[in-house]
């Protein structure tokens, strides 16, 4: 029993000593990455560009939809005219063939719309991904530079969440928070139209 107590005591001492060493060697800073990303003027610029691109796609799609509706109207008229009892058999046959050709055209427009939707979605997603990666890389590089200059060995994202959508950090102080400093430098040369007054409070962790 005494032996077990001694072992437990030694273990506690070693763990405590190790904790002291780790704390002495590490200087930790915090950063609300979601707030930095959302408030960075280039993110706002990218959002505007994506919306403009989406509007262009929507305009093209609407033109295709209009063509589709027009073709359907023409098809219905051809079917009605082909059933006209006053026309000759040859004329009826001709109109039926015209209706069949118009139906093929309609099917082609449908296929084009489906392909267009797929291509537009892929294009927008890829553009969004490229912009996001580029912006995050700029943020990471600045954080890395700032952290090294200030002697920080670790920068923790306070907006991070677990797979269960709960905060990774339940408590932390803002003594070494880099959020506002990083944002100030990122937006130092921002065009005025992209700047808005920044809140001093951090946003909720990103989901």
Model-derived regions: residue spans:
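Bacterial N-terminal signal peptides that target proteins for export
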Residues: 1-9
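Sec/Tat signal peptide C-region and signal peptidase I cleavage site
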Residues: 18-24
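Amphipathic, charged alpha-helical segments and their helix-to-coil junctions
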Residues: 24-207
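Bacterial N-terminal signal peptides
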Residues: 8-18
């Amino acid at each position: 029993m005494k032996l077990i107590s001694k072992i437990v005591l030694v273990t506690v001492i070693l763990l405590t000593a190790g904790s002291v060493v780790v704390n002495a060697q590490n200087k930790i800073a915090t950063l609300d990455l979601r707030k930095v990303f959302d408030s960075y003027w280039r993110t706002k610029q990218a959002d505007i560009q994506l919306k403009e691109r989406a509007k262009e796609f929507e305009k093209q799609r609407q033109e295709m939809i209009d063509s589709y509706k027009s073709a359907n109207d023409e098809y219905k008229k051809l079917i009605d005219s082909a059933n006209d009892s006053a026309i000759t058999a040859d004329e009826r046959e001709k109109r039926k063939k015209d209706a069949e050709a118009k139906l093929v055209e309609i099917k082609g427009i449908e296929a084009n719309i489906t392909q267009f939707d797929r291509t537009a979605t892929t294009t927008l997603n890829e553009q969004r991904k490229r912009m996001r990666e580029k912006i995050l890389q700029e943020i990471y590089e600045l954080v890395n530079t700032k952290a090294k200059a200030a002697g920080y060995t670790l920068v923790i994202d306070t907006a991070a969440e677990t797979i269960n959508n709960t905060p990774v950090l339940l408590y932390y102080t803002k003594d070494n928070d880099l959020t506002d400093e990083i944002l100030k430098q990122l937006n130092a040369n921002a065009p005025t139209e992209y700047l808005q007054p920044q809140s001093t409070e951090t946003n909720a962790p990103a989901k």
